[in-house]
Each structure stands twice: as C-alpha cells, then as structure tokens.
C-alpha cells in the first residue's frame, strides 16, 4: 500500500478543524485562485509525482499567508535534494509545488552561506570549504580565523589622543640636538633649563618656581633628577655640575672635572654620571668628597646620551662618533661596543620589562631605532623611522615605547614592542622634538622643541586600567607660560 503524503494530511486536518470552528462564511470560502494555481502545476508535473490522488484534494485555509518572497530558504535547507528512497519523492515534489504556488515560479537560489561563489574564485589560492550554520559568525568575523579568540569579542585597539592636553610656553628653550634640558622627577615636578636659568613646574599645582640663575657667563646644558626626586643635577656650559636641593631651592654642591660643556647626565643608585663635549664620562659618588671617582674613556666625540639600566648595573652611552657603548659598574673601558649606527646616538632607553634589552636611535643620517641584548651581546632588530631619532622612552606600564623625531615631520610615535607596529603618530611641534620625559605614573609624556613649547600627551595606559585618566594635568587644559 502506498504511503500517504504526510504534508497533504496536515493540510486536510487543518481544513477539517477549521470547518468545525464557528467561523464566518467568508472565511470558510475556498481560496480559488490558490487552488487553481496548484492544480495547474500538478497537471504540468503529473509524470514526476507518484501520488496524484493526494495532491488533487481541495485545500482550504483559515489564515492569511504572509509574503516571504524576500526570505532565503537556503538557510533552512528546504531545497529538494536527490533521494535514494522513491517513497520520499512525493513529499519533495509537493513541497516544491507548494512553494512555487505561494512565492512564484522562481524559488530563491540556494547559496553558500559563507558568501563564496565559484564564479568569483579568481586569483584566490585559499580553498573555500563549506561551513555549517553553527560556525557562522554573527559579528562578521570568521571564528576559525587565526588570532580570533573564542572566549569573547575582539578587543578594540587602544586609542591615543592626537592632541596634547596642555601646552606650556618655554622661552629660550634651545634648539640643540646634543643637550638634555627636560626631566620629570618621582615627586611629579618638571625641571626645564631655559637659557641660563632652571625652572621647576609642579604638575599637581601648576606652580612655577625659579630654581637657579647661572649668570650671563654660563648656561644650562643638561638637567637630571636623582632617583627619589629630591635633588637635581645641573650641567653647565663651563663644564661644571651643580647639585640642588629642590625643596629648599638651595645649591648643595658644585663638582668640576670636565673641560667643556656637560650635555648629558644620568643617575644611578648613588652614582651620578656626566657626559661632556670633551669626550669623557665622569663617575661621581655623591657620598664622597672627591669630584669624581673614575673617568670613562672611549668615545671619539661629544657624549650626548647617557642612561643607567633599571638594576643600576650597566651604563649605556651614546656619542657624536656614532658609537653606542655599554659599561659596567667597575669598568673604565666599555664592555660592549656597537657601531651599527651611522649618525650621532643621543636616544637611549633601557627596557623595564626585559633584563638587558636596550634601545638606541640614530640621527639624521641614520634614522634607525635598534634593539640590543646586552646579556648575549646581540643585535636583535632595527627599524627605519625615516626621520632623525631624537629621544626614546619605554613605558613602565605596558610593553611599548615612544620616540621623538626631527626632520621632516617633527613627529612623536608610539610603538608596540616587539612587532614595532605604530600605535599612534602625534604631530604639533614645528621644530624637531629634542626633549622628552615621562611622568612618574608612566602615563604621560612631555615633549620640548625649538619652537619654545612644552607639550603634554597622554600616550600610555595605567597599569590598572587603560581607561583611567592621568592624575596629573588632566584638569589644566590650556596654554600657559613656564616662567
């Protein structure tokens, strides 16, 4: 006995249940136009249907059928597929005819839900594979793509404000590549050398204090805060180094030893290093009465960059001889020598995250940032920045660093390490950005240039929350004068 079409039985059951309800005569009237269309389609496909008796029954309806012409029935897998069992052909044919009667003779074409079409497979090397509905991503991102986390939505890149939140006028800020005239203390006080004077700007109160005046015969060439931020070292054009108590605005000591200007200063735990145009580096122990305890010789030209490592065991120095040297605590000769740069090396920065990781930047003829492993004495990588590298500083909160540049864009670039992808490029200075310092909370940088301005930028996130605003300066938006 031939199996009856289950779909037709459902329709008949529907019409019988409708006739037993107390409905108006108008609603029990057969839908003639729909019946006629189905009968015509049945007659045209008589040879394909094995159960014409089940399809010739009158069909009644007790509801309005909505138009679904815009629906993609391929998503519901309603399109007929070849069947091995001939008894299922009747149901498939009936479904085809019913869909054609309700939505027109052209059924929506079944498509690959991934959006891939074989006609578009031109110059593509990746093989497209069928994906089930379970793997379809509602966010427009392939869940199987490399680097996509299945634990949650993809995290948006961190946004860095493209404008400084504060600008200070800094009259007489020198446009000299070999000087270091800006430093930020652990007590949140900014020191700036302007001409023959040093000024202190308190970031919490915005109060400006004149620390010292060297007189007409001398000028400030470098400033550097001690680690605790209570004392400031000042390098002068006459080769002297002065130590000032910032809280009392009182000079506590003057040390000699250099014959020419002192353009670079770096504090260790109890050692102050000074680099000079006379090509030498003097190590000064402030606990001793002597002006210096040792002299480091090796550079063939002016020393313009000095930085102690975070563990105070290694000192990196850069000079106008295009050389980068690394010294230990007790050596008078460099233990490591690097000559890959082709211009003056002023920009030097030790990583606070990886022991022995050193970054250096070259001048106009070089334009490269290079990375070194001083533990294994290896050159790790380099990147051409396409402009003079004036300064480098690592973030202590995240594995990023910032560089400041000269000709031709005078830009500031925030980099992601180790990929060295650019997080942000900041512009605004009209002269090369020669000076850079980082706030004690590690979120803000200040940059200085020959355009006689100091600009404050929020570039690094907080170690606890990337959305937390910097504690300093966020409410002091505007432009003022530092003296």
From Swiss-Prot:
GO cellular component, one term: nucleus
Description of the deletion phenotype: Reduced endoreduplication and reduced expansion in trichomes and other leaf cells. Longer roots. Root meristem contains more dividing cells with a delayed onset of endoreduplication.
Keyword set, alphabetical order: Cell cycle, Cell division, Mitosis, Nucleus, Repeat, Ubl conjugation pathway, WD repeat
Ranges: WD repeats: 174-211, 215-254, 257-294, 298-337, 340-382, 384-425, 428-467
Ranges of Polar residues composition bias in the record: 7-28
Summary of the tissues where the protein is detected: Expressed in seedlings, flowers, leaves and roots. Expressed in the differentiating cell files of the root elongation zone.
Miscellaneous comment as given in the Swiss-Prot or TrEMBL entry: FZR2 controls the induction of early rounds of endoreduplication while the remaining rounds may be mediated by FZR1 and FZR3.
Free-text function comment from the UniProt entry: Activator protein that regulates the ubiquitin ligase activity and substrate specificity of the anaphase promoting complex/cyclosome (APC/C). Necessary and sufficient for endoreduplication and correct cell expansion. Controls meristem size by stimulating endoreduplication in the elongation zone.
Similarity field: Belongs to the WD repeat CDC20/Fizzy family.
Name the record gives this protein: Protein FIZZY-RELATED 2
Classification lineage: Eukaryota, Viridiplantae, Streptophyta, Embryophyta, Tracheophyta
């Amino acid at each position: 006995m031939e199996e009856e079409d289950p779909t037709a039985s459902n329709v008949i059951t529907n019409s019988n249940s409708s006739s037993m309800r107390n409905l108006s005569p108008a609603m029990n009237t057969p839908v003639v136009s729909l019946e006629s269309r189905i009968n015509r389609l049945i007659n045209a496909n008589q040879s394909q249907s094995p159960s014409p008796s089940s399809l010739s029954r009158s069909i009644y309806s007790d509801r309005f059928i909505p138009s679904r012409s815009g629906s993609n029935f391929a998503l519901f897998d309603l399109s007929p597929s070849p069947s091995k069992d001939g008894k299922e052909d009747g149901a498939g044919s009936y479904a085809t005819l019913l869909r054609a009667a309700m939505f027109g003779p052209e059924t929506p074409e079944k498509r690959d839900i991934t959006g891939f079409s074989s006609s578009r497979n031109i110059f593509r090397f990746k093989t497209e594979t069928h994906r089930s509905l379970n793997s379809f991503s509602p966010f427009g991102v392939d869940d199987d793509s490399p680097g996509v986390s299945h634990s949650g939505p993809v995290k948006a890149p961190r946004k860095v404000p493209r404008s400084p939140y504060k600008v200070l006028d800094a009259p007489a800020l020198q446009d000299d590549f070999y000087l270091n005239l800006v430093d930020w203390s652990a007590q949140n006080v900014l020191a700036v050398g302007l001409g023959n004077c040093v000024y202190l700007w308190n970031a919490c109160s915005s109060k400006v204090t004149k620390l010292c005046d060297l007189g007409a015969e001398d000028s400030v060439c470098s400033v550097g805060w001690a680690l605790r931020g209570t004392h400031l070292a000042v390098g002068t054009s006459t080769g002297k180094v002065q130590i000032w108590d910032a809280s009392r605005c009182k000079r506590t000591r003057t040390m000699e030893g250099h014959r020419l200007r002192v353009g670079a200063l770096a504090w260790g735990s109890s050692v102050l290093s000074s680099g000079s145009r006379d090509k030498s580096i003097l190590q000064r122990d402030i606990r001793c009465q002597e002006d210096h305890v040792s002299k480091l010789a090796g550079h063939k030209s002016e020393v313009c960059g000095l930085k102690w490592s975070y563990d105070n065991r290694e000192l990196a120095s850069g000079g106008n001889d295009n050389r980068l040297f690394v010294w230990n605590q007790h050596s008078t000769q460099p233990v490591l020598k690097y000559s890959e740069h082709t211009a003056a090396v002023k920009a030097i920065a030790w990583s606070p995250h990886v022991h022995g990781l050193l970054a250096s930047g070259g001048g106009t003829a070089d334009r490269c940032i290079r990375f070194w492993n001083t533990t294994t004495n290896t050159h790790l990588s380099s990147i051409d920045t396409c402009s003079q590298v004036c300064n480098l500083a690592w973030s202590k909160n995240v594995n990023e660093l910032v560089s400041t540049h000269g000709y031709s864009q005078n830009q500031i670039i925030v980099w992601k390490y180790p990929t060295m992808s650019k997080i942000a490029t900041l512009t605004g200075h009209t002269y090369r950005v020669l000076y850079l310092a980082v706030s004690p909370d590690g979120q803000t940088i200040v940059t200085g240039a020959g355009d006689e301005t100091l600009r404050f930028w929020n570039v690094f996130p907080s170690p606890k929350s990337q959305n937390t605003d910097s504690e300093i300066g966020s409410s002091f938006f505007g432009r003022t004068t530092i003296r």
